[in-house]
Amino acid sequence: MLATRVFSLIGRRAISTSVCVRAHGSVVKSEDYALPSYVDRRDYPLPDVAHVKNLSASQKALKEKEKASWSSLSIDEKVELYRLKFKESFAEMNRSTNEWKTVVGAAMFFIGFTALLLIWEKHYVYGPIPHTFEEEWVAKQTKRMLDMKVAPIQGFSAKWDYDKNEWKK
């Protein structure tokens, strides 16, 4: 009964979502990526097209004035002409961003979340540490291996001096 209701709800949501996606497609204008596009990149300093594509009347007049001598242009007009062609200067492109703070913050968040998860697992999931990890047990096991003379040529027992009952130096 519950599974049937869940599947019907999921089915209705899937159908309504796909209808919304199909209805939404007619509103959005798709971009033609075969045409040249404007990009601000340091390694590609001259983009294929200008930043401003549709010029206003004052911008068209400024473009006509550009064809004459550049010494007659003011500094502001030269800057405006530059801004018609480029969105950012090299200084603006090279300016550091604060994106590193977001990256470091996200990394610290995930490291902290992982640490909390490990603490929770150690407390609630894992059982007690086996008795074979205790120092007393390890000492007994080492003594047993030495008594059995395990790997006497190059291994464990080769490093033990049986006459002095100590490790060789």
From Swiss-Prot:
- Pathway(s) this gene product operates in, as recorded in its UniProt entry: Energy metabolism; oxidative phosphorylation
Q: Does the keyword Protein transport apply?
A: no
Residue list for modification N6-succinyllysine: K29, K60
Please give the residue positions where the record annotates the modification N6-acetyllysine: K29, K53, K60, K67
Residues found modified as Phosphoserine: S56, S58
Q: Which UniProt keywords apply?
A: Acetylation, Membrane, Mitochondrion, Mitochondrion inner membrane, Phosphoprotein, Transit peptide, Transmembrane, Transmembrane helix
Residue ranges in the Mitochondrial intermembrane topological domain are 125-169
Subunit composition and interactions? Component of the cytochrome c oxidase (complex IV, CIV), a multisubunit enzyme composed of 14 subunits. The complex is composed of a catalytic core of 3 subunits MT-CO1, MT-CO2 and MT-CO3, encoded in the mitochondrial DNA, and 11 supernumerary subunits COX4I1 (or COX4I2), COX5A, COX5B, COX6A2 (or COX6A1), COX6B1 (or COX6B2), COX6C, COX7A1 (or COX7A2), COX7B, COX7C, COX8B and NDUFA4, which are encoded in the nuclear genome.
User: What family is it from?
Assistant: Belongs to the cytochrome c oxidase IV family.
Name listed for the protein in its UniProt record: Cytochrome c oxidase subunit 4 isoform 1, mitochondrial
Q: Which organism is it from?
A: Bos taurus (Bovine)
Q: What is the lineage of its organism?
A: Eukaryota, Metazoa, Chordata, Craniata, Vertebrata
